[in-house]
């Protein structure tokens, strides 16, 4: 239709488009009657959109019907050549598309690139699939190609994994199975093989698709199937006379690609079906070298086994027991099993077998891979006695005329037969230890139905970033008026221990002020103080101690914060906890003390500090190991010498006394005992209770009467309370200084992704040293 090119025409068409958006039918009707003739079919000058385009895009079926009744043409095109039907199909608006189809919209129109309406239906939704069905029912060309030479069926096969139903529908409607992209040489079969959709590959081959076509790079469909490791597609291609040994321009065979991906079954299959095992690509690498380079032992093993078989057959006078025609016949018969069983059923003698002549006749009529003499030889191998006939089930197994390792039944996981083979030795019984977590139902929920209390709201300053930031904060609360024109972001809740590890003191402070206990445990029994000690954040530790955190709280393994601090090797945090009342000989679930954790981290300063303040190094854990035994196990001679010195300086005990420390009793860090009848789930799992104060209803009569009697109504309150107050943030200079202190504390390695805390670093170094020693 005509583009509006005059000022009055422009104004009128824009007015019509605006009325379509506003659904103003009266004004549209008035403009079409009194405006330019055929105004309803005019398009605006920029994008070429008409009124029907807008209605179709918005899926306003009422407006689409109204415009069609006013005389709107369903085939008007925009500047891209797209009709309203194409725009509706692109967005999956099936209702609008159905109305346009009933209005006899032309489904064969193409846009400026040669794309028909079906190109706009290639998206992985049910609505787009229904749009494609509508287009096909009303005459869309299923063999439409773009001006660059890409057919619609090939375009659908490029996304076959997502639009499988669309591809199968195109095939049923008569799409060319040999659709080819003239610019690249790719066929629909190659694209379907690359996507790994067996149903589409089978549909193409059954409809006469060319199986041995190759693209401009001499890539065959088998190359793409092998690259993706699609074993079932490789079977299909070979069964339909596909060549799995074709060499591409870069010198790679399908076996090279299967070896690159480490697909052992694919490597075995391709090697058995005639691919050259010794062929080298342009990098001068054989398939086995490629598999070995990638570290795929199973694939390399299969190729090596095939090479040994090939070397035996290369000897003079050797006969191949698995000829290529027999392999192809076997794969084809398995693929067409249902079809062949129907043909055999007519000639069945009643015992599941047919005569030799009938067997040869049925197969000779339906395949070209084996001659009548070869089929007769196969039938003879199946006859147990003269005239005994061919057992149909035995034929489909293929083991009568092929080796067991070459039939399709040898692939895939092997089933173990009951009662066969020797019984292996019973391994050491290992008690399965699940991850111990507090169940969600044990946590009390918020009154408003929000998440559990260990999930706290993250705090952040919401302000106009063009006016204020961390380096230029507002001077006073009234100056920051951005709350009046910036919307509040939605509440975001995070695990209290994740926030603790990140050092977000503002969020923690807000949570504690709202009634969240400072010793709140998450679903892994950890309190914020434990997490802060484990991550080595001394600022958060100080903050939590100021808030009254329990320094002797325990998790499910009875670790205290001091255990975590010693395990992390944080000397200053250890001193801070001890000064705050932490028990230096607190026993964990296996009777290990903080001293044992410090020894495991190989931190000499922490071990020396604990020994100096009186930590008992004679105590033994459940395995009977003392501090000296642990030090010897971790092989730090500095700590061994230190403990040995302490042992030498001990006063000698009396002869009738044994030098064996008593394990301190396990501390109860929870509240007072509760009667079993009144015991809650939260107390069973050690979850602290959260108290939410009752909010006084401002409309309550009692509350209002108390205000009146107290003279509150006579007071003039001029207090201004800002809606939001800027929370102090660290400046850029402070953040840089904080990073410098962090580097001084944890060394420069803290800035790298592979940073490890002392214990993990110690274990890793020991393991690497042991591995290096074993290699030498």
Swiss-Prot record:
Swiss-Prot/TrEMBL ANK repeat ranges: 47-76, 184-213, 217-246, 250-279, 524-553, 557-586, 590-619, 623-652
SMART domains, sorted: ANK
A GO molecular-function descriptor: calcium ion binding
EF-hand domain: residues covered: 335-369
Assigned keywords, A-Z: ANK repeat, Repeat
InterPro entries: Ankyrin-EF-hand, Ankyrin_rpt, Ankyrin_rpt-contain_sf, EF-hand-dom_pair, EF_hand_dom
Name of protein: Ankyrin repeat and EF-hand domain-containing protein 1
Gene behind the chain: ANKEF1
């Amino acid at each position: 239709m005509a583009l509006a090119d005059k000022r009055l025409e422009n104004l009128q068409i824009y007015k019509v488009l605006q009325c379509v958006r506003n659904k103003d039918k009266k004004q549209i009707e008035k403009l079409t009657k009194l405006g330019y003739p055929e105004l309803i079919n005019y398009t605006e000058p920029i994008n070429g959109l008409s009124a029907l385009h807008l209605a179709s895009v918005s899926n306003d079926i009422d407006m689409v019907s109204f415009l069609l009744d006013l005389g709107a043409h369903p085939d008007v095109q925009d500047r891209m050549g797209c009709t309203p039907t194409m725009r509706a199909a692109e967005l999956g608006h099936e209702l609008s598309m159905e109305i346009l189809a009933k209005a006899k919209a032309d489904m064969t129109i193409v846009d400026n690139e040669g794309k028909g309406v079906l190109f706009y239906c290639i998206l992985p939704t049910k609505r787009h699939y229904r749009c494609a069905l509508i287009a096909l029912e009303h005459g869309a060309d299923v063999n439409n190609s773009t001006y660059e030479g890409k057919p619609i069926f090939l375009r659908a096969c490029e996304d076959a994994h997502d639009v499988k139903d669309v591809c199968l529908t195109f095939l049923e409607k008569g799409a060319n199975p040999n659709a080819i992209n003239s610019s690249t040489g790719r066929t629909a079969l190659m694209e379907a093989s690359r996507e790994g959709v067996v149903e589409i590959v089978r549909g193409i081959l059954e409809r006469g698709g060319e199986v041995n076509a190759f693209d401009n790079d001499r890539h065959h469909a088998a190359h793409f199937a092998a690259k993706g490791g699609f074993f079932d597609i490789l079977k299909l291609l070979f069964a339909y006379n596909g060549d799995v040994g074709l060499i591409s321009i870069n010198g790679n065979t399908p076996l090279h690609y299967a070896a690159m991906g480490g697909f052992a079954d694919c490597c075995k299959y391709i090697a058995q079906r005639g691919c050259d095992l010794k062929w080298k690509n342009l990098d001068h690498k054989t398939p086995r070298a490629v598999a070995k380079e990638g570290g795929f032992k199973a694939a390399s093993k299969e190729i090596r086994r095939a090479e040994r078989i090939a070397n035996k057959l290369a000897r003079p006078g050797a006969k191949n027991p698995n000829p290529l025609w027999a392999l192809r016949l076997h794969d084809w018969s398995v693929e067409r099993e249902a079809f062949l069983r129907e043909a055999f059923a007519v000639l069945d003698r009643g015992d599941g077998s047919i005569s030799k002549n009938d067997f040869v006749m049925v197969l000779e009529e339906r395949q070209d891979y084996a001659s009548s003499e070869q089929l007769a030889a196969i039938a003879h191998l199946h006859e147990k006695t003269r005239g005994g006939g061919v057992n149909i089930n035995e034929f489909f197994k293929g083991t009568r005329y092929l080796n067991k390792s070459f039939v399709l039944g040898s692939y895939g996981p092997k089933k173990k037969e009951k009662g066969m083979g020797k019984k292996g030795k019973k391994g050491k019984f290992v008690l399965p230890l699940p991850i111990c977590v507090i169940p969600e139902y044990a946590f009390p929920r918020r009154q408003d139905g929000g998440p559990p209390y260990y999930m706290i709201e993250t705090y952040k300053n919401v302000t106009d970033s063009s006016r204020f930031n961390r380096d230029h904060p507002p001077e006073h609360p009234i100056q920051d008026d951005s709350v009046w024109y910036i919307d509040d972001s939605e509440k975001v809740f995070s695990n209290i221990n994740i926030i603790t590890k990140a050092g977000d003191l503002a969020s923690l402070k807000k949570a504690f002020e709202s009634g969240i206990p400072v010793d709140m445990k998450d679903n892994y029994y950890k309190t914020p103080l434990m997490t802060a000690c484990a991550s080595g954040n001394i600022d958060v530790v100080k903050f939590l101690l100021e808030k009254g955190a329990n320094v002797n709280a325990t998790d499910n393994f009875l670790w205290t914060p001091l255990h975590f601090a010693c395990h992390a090797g944080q000397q200053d945090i250890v001193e801070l906890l001890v000064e705050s009342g932490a028990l230096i000989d607190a026993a964990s679930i296996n009777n290990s003390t903080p001293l044992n954790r410090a020894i495991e981290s190989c931190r000499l300063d922490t071990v020396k500090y604990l020994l100096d303040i009186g930590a008992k190094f004679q105590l033994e854990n459940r395995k009977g190991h003392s501090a000296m035994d642990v030090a010897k196990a971790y092989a730090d001679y500095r700590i061994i010498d230190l403990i040995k010195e302490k042992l030498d300086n001990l006063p000698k005990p009396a002869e009738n006394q044994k030098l064996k420390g008593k394990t301190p009793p396990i501390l109860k860090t929870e509240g007072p005992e509760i009667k079993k009848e009144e015991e809650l789930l939260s107390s069973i799992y050690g979850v602290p209770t959260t108290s939410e104060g009752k909010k006084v209803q401002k409309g309550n009569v009692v509350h209002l009467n108390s205000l009146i009697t107290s003279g509150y109504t006579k007071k003039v309150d001029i207090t201004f309370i800002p809606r939001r107050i800027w929370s102090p943030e660290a400046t850029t200079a402070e953040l840089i200084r904080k990073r410098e202190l962090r580097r001084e504390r944890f060394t420069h390695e803290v800035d790298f992704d592979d940073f490890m805390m002392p214990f993990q670093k110690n274990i890793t170094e020991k393991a690497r040293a042991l591995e290096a020693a074993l290699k030498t």
